[in-house]
């Protein structure tokens, strides 16, 4: 990690989930990253990810709890998902296609705007934490 950083945001795990990588492997990899950040003694924000139901309830349960647990373990600010603005009644809005780039995976400008609105309050907390350091 570069010296002199004021804070870190870790937003990983989505591609691991899409590849069906075991939650315990994802957790171990995240811990490796978080330990490096912990050694730097800088404020941390973790952005989580959710597994879909089609991986089975055990996988979903194990995967979904990785990020909130690690945020607690590492005293990090936490945002449950970049998808939060699109979750309705516990599931993703069925009209999501309008928010994706042509690849069907990555957000377009409209979605990025919604992400910024969602992440903004937690990000401001991170900025405040850096000024208190």
Residue ranges and their predicted role:
Residues 1-133:
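Alpha-helical cap/lid subdomain in secreted, periplasmic
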């Amino acid at each position: 990690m570069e010296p002199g950083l004021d804070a870190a945001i870790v937003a990983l795990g989505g591609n691991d989930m899409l590849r069906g990588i075991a939650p315990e492997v994802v957790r171990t990899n995240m811990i490796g990253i978080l330990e490096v950040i912990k050694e730097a003694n800088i404020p941390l924000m973790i952005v989580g990810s959710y597994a879909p139901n089609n991986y089975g309830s055990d996988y979903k349960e194990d995967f979904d709890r990785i990020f909130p647990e690690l945020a607690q373990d590492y005293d990090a600010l936490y945002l449950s998902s970049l998808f939060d603005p699109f979750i309705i009644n516990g599931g993703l809005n069925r009209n999501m296609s309008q928010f994706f780039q042509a690849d069907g995976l990555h957000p377009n400008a409209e979605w990025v705007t919604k992400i910024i609105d969602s992440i903004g309050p937690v990000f401001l907390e991170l900025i405040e934490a850096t000024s208190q350091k």
